[in-house]
Amino acid sequence: MRSLTAAARRPEVLLLLLCILQPSQPGGVPGAVPGGVPGGVFFPGAGLGGLGVGGLGPGVKPAKPGVGGLVGPGLGAEGSALPGAFPGGFFGAGGGAAGAAAAYKAAAKAGAAGLGVGGIGGVGGLGVSTGAVVPQLGAGVGAGVKPGKVPGVGLPGVYPGGVLPGAGARFPGIGVLPGVPTGAGVKPKAQVGAGAFAGIPGVGPFGGQQPGLPLGYPIKAPKLPAGYGLPYKTGKLPYGFGPGGVAGSAGKAGYPTGTGVGPQAAAAAAKAAAKLGAGGAGVLPGVGVGGPGIPGAPGAIPGIGGIAGVGAPDAAAAAAAAAKAAKFGAAGGLPGVGVPGVGVPGVGVPGVGVPGVGVPGVGVPGVGVPGVGVPGVGVPGVGVPGVGVPGALSPAATAKAAAKAAKFGARGAVGIGGIPTFGLGPGGFPGIGDAAAAPAAAAAKAAKIGAGGVGALGGVVPGAPGAIPGLPGVGGVPGVGIPAAAAAKAAAKAAQFGLGPGVGVAPGVGVVPGVGVVPGVGVAPGIGLGPGGVIGAGVPAAAKSAAKAAAKAQFRAAAGLPAGVPGLGVGAGVPGLGVGAGVPGLGVGAGVPGPGAVPGTLAAAKAAKFGPGGVGALGGVGDLGGAGIPGGVAGVVPAAAAAAKAAAKAAQFGLGGVGGLGVGGLGAVPGAVGLGGVSPAAAAKAAKFGAAGLGGVLGAGQPFPIGGGAGGLGVGGKPPKPFGGALGALGFPGGACLGKSCGRKRK
């Protein structure tokens, strides 16, 4: 009894322990009841059928609950003394029979026995599970069975390939792809219009699986190739296949377009060949014979054009060589009878009768033109390049060699046209044995310069050429005479400095040099001594050019010139304002031009445009006119430059004086404006309308007489139409001929 009582208390202790222990959560439903503590751990003799891995023993039916749902200790058939009475502990997790029943019910829902892993040994019902196990990929469920929810399980054709019967026939050959989840809306799509068999190898327009891509890729069915089904396209089938192996739409035999092969490519080649024309028929295929045909035309077989034959060389090359040879002249004389060699340079050729008998000299070029039989009798041609034609050499090569040889002259021949050094027969090789080449070259060069003929008089004009220009003759030595052009040039240059020193009445000698009796006045200032010479009556035709050059070369204030230089000195008849027949100028005698009155060359240049003036009434008789200081001694008045500037400005208006004839500008001191005649500037202005009249005494403040003074109408001047010469007296503007008011303005 004692042992039974002690044994009966053990469940109480175990219950107490169960109250203290916390239930294990990770165990989950599977294995909660089964998989308790193995038998024999807490209850000796429990064995594998008790709380072991399998819970209930093999083939053992679970005990039914006792009366009232509770089993008293040691009572009933299911007493605690029986091993394995209650799986998973004394009363299970729920306590008593009810708890055990609940545990069994939960275990039944969890699945068949044998799936769970035994929990940790200890109190029954607290076993730890590893969680849900993902079944491995396999053949899945059978046909007609709903596939499970686990990814990859239950779908037909789990692995690529393989057509499964039944439900799997809808997607033959398309299985679940590794790494691609299913059930997320990703479904294989059939090609447009392809029906249910799209994607099946060999069925439908799609060619099936592509090389390098796993089956099922791309996820979306690929699009049709560009231009598929159109009437005009590349001619290639899509992906190289057609539906059912039949050629696709718009397919055609032969090579596809654009590959460079086929009729289109041949047509293009023929079109290009047509531009070049058809090849002529050559003797040998591909080798045309040079002839009248088009040079280079391909033969029967397009290839090498005609080969230049023995025919004449290219005309262009021959012409070029001939043109070059022509620069040095042809050998021999004028084309005639004889051939260079026989009568070539020798008999009547340059040499014997050539430049010699009638050569320049004796019968100077003209009489016996260069040479009796000079180049003319014997002409290069008959026997020269002709009789002894230059071997097999072509004319072009011969001409080229001859042209080059002509530069250095021909080699001397032996005898009269004898056998040349290197040639055979008369004429020999062109250029060898032809002595005319050198003379011809010299003659050609001389021809550029022209032959010197016998001039009319030696030196007058370089000798005129003879009848036929030849070698320079004995004619006058060129250069002895004064050519018109050279003389004109020299005269023009000399005109800048004047002709020769003038002589003047009393060259440059005044009462007191630089002072004069009355500075710049004289008895009748501006009249002068001797006849004043007609203005411009000096040099005739050349006056204009000389005056123009003199005007350009005039020297302003402070520049002295030697005696008699045009512009200031008195010269012989040259147009000017000087006294006597002196050189045009303003000073008397050979005075040195200086800052006195403005040089008269300007007026002369202006007057020269209108021709020489008429002969003045009086030649300008003054007591001491022109014997004043030769305007060149600078000095008593302000500086030469200032005086010249003032004089130039005053000259624009001028002072009354003898119109155009007297000795103008003989001031007291060179550079100062004297009371004498009209200044050159005024004279230049007045010169447009003719020479001024004589008028009264200048510079005394007198009123301008009618027709006199600077503005009056001079001798021979044409009076204005309205009032004749009374304009000045009547007070009309322009009476004094001030500036542009005199007469009609020029446009």
Curated annotation (Swiss-Prot):
Keywords: Disulfide bond, Extracellular matrix, Hydroxylation, Repeat, Secreted, Signal. It is found in: Secreted, Extracellular space, Extracellular matrix. The keyword Repeat applies. The modification 4-hydroxyproline is found at residues 34, 65, 87, 165, 178, 181, 201, 298, 302, 335, 365, 370, 375, 380, 385, 462, 478, 513, 566, 575, 584, 593, 599, 630, 719, 733. The modification Hydroxyproline is found at residue 188. One of its GO terms (molecular function) is extracellular matrix structural constituent. Disulfide bonds join 737-742. Residues 1-26 form the signal peptide. Its main location: secreted. Major structural protein of tissues such as aorta and nuchal ligament, which must expand rapidly and recover completely. Molecular determinant of the late arterial morphogenesis, stabilizing arterial structure by regulating proliferation and organization of vascular smooth muscle. The polymeric elastin chains are cross-linked together into an extensible 3D network. Forms a ternary complex with BGN and MFAP2. Interacts with MFAP2 via divalent cations (calcium > magnesium > manganese) in a dose-dependent and saturating manner. Interacts with FBLN5 and FBN1. Forms a ternary complex with FBN1 and FBLN2 or FBLN5. Interacts with MFAP4 in a Ca (2+)-dependent manner; this interaction promotes ELN self-assembly. Interacts with EFEMP2 with moderate affinity. This is Elastin. The gene is ELN.
